[in-house]
Design a protein with these regions (language model features):
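N-terminal signal peptide c-region/cleavage motif recognized by signal peptidases
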Residues: 21-26
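Compact, glycine-rich, soluble single-domain proteins
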Residues: 27-156
């Protein structure tokens, strides 16, 4: 009986360790190979990776040590809703623009690395664009500014 229990325990422990290893694999390295989209705001161009699945959105820009100035990540949700973001496992400071279906920026939040405080949209939005911290203010882009790109045209 004791031997049977030990065998069951070892099997359960092995299964648990395998499950932990498989589920944590996605956070061992940053996401670098996501589909991309070109966005603009006036003369400013953005090369944004698209985080469109729940897994891609959950990982986001975690574990990145740097990001080129013209690049970012746009989070695409199925429906407009109040969106809140944390900086868990995110190593670089970011600015997040919360964007309505038509590409208008609702609000922008500045976010510190590794902080667990929530940064939320002021109203329901479908899109959130993360860029290096201060990128929007340096370009004169603020709440009410409009972004152009195929994602926003598709919503018309």
């Amino acid at each position: 009986m004791k031997q049977k229990f030990m065998r069951y325990f070892q099997y359960s422990l092995s299964s648990l360790l395998l499950l932990v290893a498989l589920t944590s694999h996605g956070q061992d390295a940053p996401q670098l190979n996501l589909e991309r989209v070109k966005l603009t705001s006036g003369m400013h161009r953005i090369d944004a990776q698209i985080a469109g699945t729940p897994e891609q959105r959950q990982t986001g820009l975690m574990l990145r040590k740097e990001m080129p100035q013209h690049e970012g990540m746009i989070f695409v949700f199925d429906q407009p809703a109040k969106q809140c973001f944390l900086m868990k496992n995110t190593l670089i400071p970011l600015s997040a623009a919360f964007i309505s279906d038509d590409g208008v920026i609702v609000n922008i939040e500045e976010m510190k690395p590794l902080a667990l405080d929530a940064h939320c949209s002021a109203q329901p939005v479908r899109y959130v664009l993360e860029m290096n911290k201060g990128w929007f203010s340096k370009k004169g882009i603020k709440a009410g500014s409009k972004l152009q790109g195929p994602l926003f045209q598709a919503q018309k």
